[in-house]
């Protein structure tokens, strides 16, 4: 069946976790997640290609629509499981590789939050070192892709996101080699270095995680404040594209001022909807995050209260960004 990530649904996915080294027997996990959790991962996954283009009207909405269209076009559902869609079978191998790369990133963002409590994940391309130089390359093999941060432990992690059609040992080995080159982030040893790869097994989408124990001699040095600012940059710009428009509303949750954006997006595939040409994604974040770029960590003290107030048809990340079932301005559900 067709995937529509704006429709409320719980999915399942087999994830294999492997420790460092080849002798470790993997631990299989049946990961459950909702469409809202996956939407949150797609929303917060800011890919480096966006840095190529200057700002233009509705740039961030265009990016989000593109990412959403790729995910929905590439995948079908079989009950609660996601599988490879025959729609992409005619594509050139390079085009398929590009789609696999995007899926690998989307699900790495989802999995690191679900299984490793990583609140923040950002591509290294967005960061600059203490001298203001971009991290175009940080090692012999290739630039390491993703830097994770956990506020409670004040800990950094290194992640390589891979997306493949098959379970490729070579891709995992290359990812481990890349991650292993990093010795420290801002003077601290990473608490975790790992590769997360999505692939298809008998047509079903699976994921594999392999940890890396090697300690390289490369150090990454950047401002934590700049890291957090860059993490929220694409979401802030999405909200600012619609600021003071009728698509936005103010609301107060647990005594905190939020701004909620009702973002219309098209149905991309024939058959996704028999009547409508458009649906909505409802995204919210604290007003202070948008207007003043202030440190967001205080929001974590209110997470449980906020989750109760938002209800079941939603997902609130530890980053303070939520996705929920679309509501109109009278607080009535869009159906």
Q: Which role fits each region the language model picked out?
A:
Residues 1-31:
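N-terminal alpha-helical "arm" segments
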Residues 31-111:
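Interdomain/boundary linker segments immediately adjacent to catalytic/signaling cores
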Residues 109, 163-226:
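Catalytic cores of nucleic-acid endonucleases
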Residues 113-120, 149-155, 185-189:
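Secondary-structure boundary elements
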Residues 114-138:
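A short acidic/basic microdomain associated with nuclease active sites
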Residues 140-144:
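Short, surface-exposed coil-to-beta transition loops
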Residues 145-150, 154-167:
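Conserved catalytic cores of phosphodiester-cleaving nucleases, focusing on short active-site segments
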Residues 211-335:
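Extended, charged low-complexity segments
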